[in-house]
């Protein structure tokens, strides 16, 4: 994976500092704070991300926290990143710390970080709501610890309509999915939520810490397809061809 080891450490103060308190003037306006979950999964919605974001960027943003899985939401038809993702943490303290990143500036974007709202399922298990018209799968991971199903939803309470059309997501962004058969739908968040987002003023922007990525050290994608014209065995030739040449 490309090297993304340096976000500005000044942006990572302890809970309640640096990035603007939730619901304060430095945040996204007046909002009702959600209760932290008392049992897994401990999942955060992260929105308003640059469209060239990759998993390594998310790992770097939350590098000091205990991340279990990352799900980058992509358009079903174009496979383009839609500007938001879901990050599950191993314990509630990491989720609590992640919430303090809400309002931090990444380039000219003000990050949105919130608790992904969960709801109990009729048949057991725990799901998330993030409304949308269609169901999309989000499977694939390393260290499998529970399946990902698409029949239930995710909801963060943010309005991401400007991030693009509805669509699905590409499987297998990072590690295992949440336990107890959690399920997802990855369309834009529900309207009419209990949180309102407003763009920060210039004064507020000046007070917020800025997150900066170093250039990626790997210029060529690691999963790039090999050149089909390249010789698999270098300059080696079949044995029959070698014998024929010696006889000549």
Curated annotation (Swiss-Prot):
Residues annotated with Phosphoserine modification: 13-14, 21, 24, 32, 230
Biased composition (Gly residues): 15-29
Keyword RNA-binding in annotation: yes
Main location: cytoplasm
Gene3D superfamilies, sorted: 3.30.70.330
Acetylation listed as a keyword: yes
Location in or out of the cell: Cytoplasm, Perinuclear region
Any GO BP: eukaryotic translation initiation factor 4F complex assembly
Biased composition (Polar residues): 220-230
UniProt biased composition (Basic and acidic residues): 131-163, 196-207, 237-248
Functional note: Stimulates the RNA helicase activity of EIF4A in the translation initiation complex. Binds weakly mRNA.
Protein name: Eukaryotic translation initiation factor 4H
Protein species of origin: Rattus norvegicus
Gene label: Eif4h
